[in-house]
């Protein structure tokens, strides 16, 4: 769900507002879940080629529906934007029982870009941690220890990608970051 109010000023200095309403078209997204710290779940099979290009035919899409207004008050997000400021390559890659372990040689925060030629429906998990426990990434030192989240430790600092299986696929999480 979303509501959009885009205000802009044209070259002549006149202000304009574009607001979303029931005339807008909508379709399901390949982004199934996102959380600033928990990670993303992205299904590449649901991608719609060209959806964000001029002239895309969205006539098969549904019209947007008015949803109940959320409770609470709107607040401006004060978090700094997540920008690419550096790209790192791993200093080592080790095969483990559960997959591969990538060591970047430093403690940092960011996201990993996945480039893969996977099989249709193949599910790939990218787990992040700042140190190892029993040879696997451990998140005990970087998750928010709250009682009601204890059951969700499995999902902390993890991105999940499901492959389309049609050649090289590239996935970079857009709405999260991790310590590793």
Which stretches of residues belong to each language-model region?
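Extracellular/oxidizing-compartment recognition motifs
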Residues: 1-180
């Amino acid at each position: 769900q979303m509501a959009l109010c885009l205000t802009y000023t044209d070259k002549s200095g006149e202000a304009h507002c574009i607001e979303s309403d029931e005339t807008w078209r909508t379709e399901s997204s390949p982004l199934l879940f996102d959380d600033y710290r928990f990670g993303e779940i992205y299904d590449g099979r649901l991608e719609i080629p060209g959806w964000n290009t001029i002239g895309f035919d969205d006539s098969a899409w549904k019209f947007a529906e008015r949803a109940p207004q959320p409770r609470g008050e709107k607040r401006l997000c004060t978090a700094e934007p997540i920008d690419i400021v550096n790209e790192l390559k791993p200093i080592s890659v080790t095969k483990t029982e559960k997959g591969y372990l990538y060591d970047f040689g430093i403690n940092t925060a960011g996201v990993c870009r996945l480039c893969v030629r996977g099989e249709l429906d193949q599910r790939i998990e990218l787990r992040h941690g700042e140190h190892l426990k029993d040879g696997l990434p451990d998140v005990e030192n970087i998750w928010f220890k709250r009682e009601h989240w204890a059951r969700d430790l499995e999902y902390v600092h993890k991105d999940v990608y499901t492959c389309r299986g049609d050649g090289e696929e590239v996935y970079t999480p857009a709405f999260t970051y991790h310590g590793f």
